[in-house]
């Protein structure tokens, strides 16, 4: 028995996506968003799918790729302050199960949105642009890279 030893992470952001039930909660949240959009009377099914995809990807971009730092005071000498949540996830190790899940989920949503919009060119362009905006920052080659100095500080 270790008395007086903390069993917490140095940076809680690194493991939050591996928590019990996180993936199920995430999927249920996306499903709930879609049901809410479908319940709005003047939205057609293709519009609801496109909005679900765009809102999901916008939220994913903001929370995983735009916001930097951690809401916790961490003993890592400020290293996490300069990293996005995606870069902190699983201590920066690439191709973990959480990273794979959060990479494949927008792709699955994109396929669903494309299918239910019947590949309408307008919806297809919007959905593709939205997908690329969240897939490109997830590439291992862009880990820690700030294009044109955007989000550098």
From Swiss-Prot:
What are the record keywords, sorted? Answer: Endoplasmic reticulum, Membrane, Transmembrane, Transmembrane helix
What ranges are annotated Cytoplasmic (topological domains)?
A: 1-26, 65-100, 141-153
Gene Ontology, cellular component aspect: endoplasmic reticulum; endoplasmic reticulum membrane; serine palmitoyltransferase complex
Per the record, the GO terms for biological process are: ceramide metabolic process; intracellular sphingolipid homeostasis; motor behavior; myelination; negative regulation of ceramide biosynthetic process; sphingolipid biosynthetic process; sphingomyelin biosynthetic process
Q: Which InterPro entries match?
A: ORMDL
- Localisation: Endoplasmic reticulum membrane
Does this UniProt record's set of keywords contain 4Fe-4S? Answer: no
What Pfam families does the annotation carry?
ORMDL
Question: What are the TM regions of this chain, as residue ranges?
Answer: 27-46, 47-64, 101-121, 124-140
Per its UniProt record, what PANTHER family does this chain match? ORMDL PROTEINS
Q: Which family does it belong to?
A: Belongs to the ORM family.
Q: Under which name does UniProt file this protein?
A: ORM1-like protein 1
Q: Which organism is it from?
A: Homo sapiens
């Amino acid at each position: 028995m270790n008395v007086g030893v903390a069993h917490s992470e140095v940076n809680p952001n690194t493991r939050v996506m591996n928590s019990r039930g996180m993936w199920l909660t995430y999927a249920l949240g996306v499903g709930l968003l879609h049901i809410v959009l479908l319940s709005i009377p003047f939205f057609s099914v293709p519009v609801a799918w496109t909005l679900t995809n765009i809102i999901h990807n916008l939220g994913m971009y903001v929370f995983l790729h735009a916001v930097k730092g951690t809401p916790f005071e961490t003993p890592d000498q400020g290293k996490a302050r300069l990293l996005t949540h995606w870069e902190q996830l699983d201590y920066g190790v690439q191709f973990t199960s959480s990273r794979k899940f959060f990479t494949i989920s927008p792709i699955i949503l994109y396929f669903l949105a494309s299918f239910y919009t019947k590949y309408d060119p307008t919806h297809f362009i919007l959905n593709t642009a939205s997908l690329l905006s969240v897939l490109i920052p997830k590439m291992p080659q862009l880990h820690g890279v700030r294009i044109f100095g955007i989000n550098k500080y």
